């Protein structure tokens, strides 16, 4: 590793002497702040501003991002409420020019009704397998490269979703509708003014998952399944937490397309030490009988305040450069500062 990488790594570790490691999982978002609450109606605003420097082969790239979200709730009665949520993510990668590659991603847009027996929403929301990949997706930057989710199991639009918590059992289910298309007599997609009929794109599907917590033992297990068109997959995961230590594993298997088998597994470990959290993951996946992911990553996260942190993360890419090429087999160093609001 060249001197530039070493210098940046040392400086990133040195500047962060901060205060609070809020748990071992460093990848999630924090709760927002309530800006309005009256007569059973509340509005929370949250998000993050995150500066992220990525270095591969000594070359730098700006992967910085800002997320902003709004959560509104309205109490209908003692056991029923309405909910609406939006989150957008703005990224910038100008390549030395003025606003040439900026983008806005509408990550979530949904509304629904919740109560004693769970919450039902419609819109762009998470499928059911995200809570399973969360078992091992614990790092500030790297990780989660072997448990690939098909579209219907991930964050996608046109989705009817349910989640509920019943004691130690949490369940999620989602169904994505196929998208309507206007087509001509030959089946070609056209504008509605020139259409002969409606069709759909065949992208409907569903996902299911369940997580069970064994009381206060620190042991959790999870399982999930998803199916969409020619794609399907299942996931199994388990974790164990003991005071400041955390261990987890995940296995997934399925088809990413017709006759394209996919198998992957992830291992994760974390340790919380006062002001800091240290995490490590190993990811391995095989697609169509070829190794598509093979890496080991470590990171350290330091908290100045509960909502402000710095981190450094390094991924050792173990793919064979003779098989996948130099670019696809490069290691990566990432340095970041993150402010949550």
Curated annotation (Swiss-Prot):
The signal peptide here is 1-21
**Is the keyword rRNA processing assigned to this protein?**
no
Highest taxon of the lineage: Bacteria
Membrane topology classification: Multi-pass membrane protein
What the entry lists under Gene3D superfamilies is as follows:
Porin
Q: Which InterPro entries match?
A: Gram-neg_bact_OMP, Gram_neg_porin_domain, Porin_dom_sf
GO cellular component terms listed in the entry, alphabetical order: cell outer membrane; pore complex
| Location of the protein in the cell | Cell outer membrane
Keyword terms of this UniProt record: Cell outer membrane, Ion transport, Membrane, Porin, Signal, Transmembrane, Transmembrane beta strand, Transport
Describe the function of this protein: Forms pores that allow passive diffusion of small molecules across the outer membrane.
Regarding protein family, the annotation reads: Belongs to the Gram-negative porin family.
What is the name of the protein in this document? Outer membrane protein U
